[in-house]
C-alpha cells in the first residue's frame, strides 16, 4: 500500500505564500533541492489542485540538459516520469504528459489509489492537502521551514484540523532551512 505524503515549504510562521501570493523566498538552494530530489524519487503519482498544477507544469518542459543546475535537471526528470492527477472544476483540459483531470477529490477514490499504487503518492498545495488531511488520508507530512517570517498569507496547514504527529526525521541545512518528517497518527 502506498503512502500519501503532504510536503510543503513554508515560512517559520507557517505560510507557503505571503499575503501578496509571493513565494520566491521558498525556492530551494542546491543542497535543499538535492535532498528534496531524494525524497521525490519514491513518488509515483502527484495530486494537484489547479493553482499548484499551474506552478508545477513548468517541469514538464524544463530543460534537462547541460547548462541547467544539476538538481533542477534531476527534479525535472523525476517529475516528468511520474503520473499526475489534477483536481479542478475550472479547468477543461490539462497539457502535460502523464496527466489526467478529475473534477472531484473523492475519499474513496484516494483510498483505492493508495491501495493499488506501487509507489508513494504526493498531495501538493495547501487547499488540496487540507481536504486530504481533513479526511484522514495523509500518512506523512514533510515540512521544510524557511528562516523567514512573512506575517500572513496562505497557510501550509488547515485550520480546524487536529493531527497527532510522530517525528520520524529531522535535518538542518546550511541556508537555515529545517526539514521535519512526521507520521500522521490515525
Which residues are covered by each model-predicted region?
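Enzymes that bind and transform nitrogen-containing heteroaromatic metabolites
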Residues: 1-186
Amino acid at each position: 500500500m502506498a503512502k500519501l505524503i503532504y510536503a510543503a515549504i513554508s515560512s517559520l510562521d507557517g505560510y507557503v505564500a505571503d499575503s501578496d501570493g509571493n513565494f520566491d523566498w521558498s525556492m530551494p538552494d542546491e543542497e535543499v533541492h538535492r535532498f528534496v530530489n531524494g525524497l521525490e524519487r519514491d513518488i509515483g503519482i502527484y495530486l494537484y489542485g489547479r493553482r499548484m498544477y499551474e506552478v508545477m507544469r513548468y517541469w514538464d518542459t524544463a530543460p534537462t540538459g547541460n547548462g541547467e543546475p544539476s538538481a533542477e535537471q534531476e527534479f525535472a526528470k523525476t517529475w516528468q516520469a511520474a503520473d499526475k492527477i489534477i483536481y479542478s472544476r475550472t479547468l477543461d483540459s490539462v497539457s502535460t504528459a502523464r496527466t489526467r483531470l478529475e473534477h472531484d477529490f473523492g475519499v474513496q477514490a484516494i483510498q483505492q489509489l493508495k491501495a493499488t499504487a506501487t509507489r508513494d503518492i504526493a498531495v501538493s498545495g495547501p487547499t488540496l492537502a487540507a481536504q486530504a488531511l481533513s479526511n484522514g488520508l495523509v500518512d506523512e507530512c514533510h515540512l521544510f521551514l524557511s528562516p523567514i517570517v512573512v506575517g500572513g498569507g496562505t497557510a501550509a496547514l488547515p485550520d480546524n484540523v487536529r493531527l497527532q504527529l510522530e517525528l520520524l526525521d529531522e535535518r538542518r541545512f546550511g541556508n537555515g532551512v529545517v526539514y521535519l518528517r512526521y507520521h500522521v497518527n490515525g
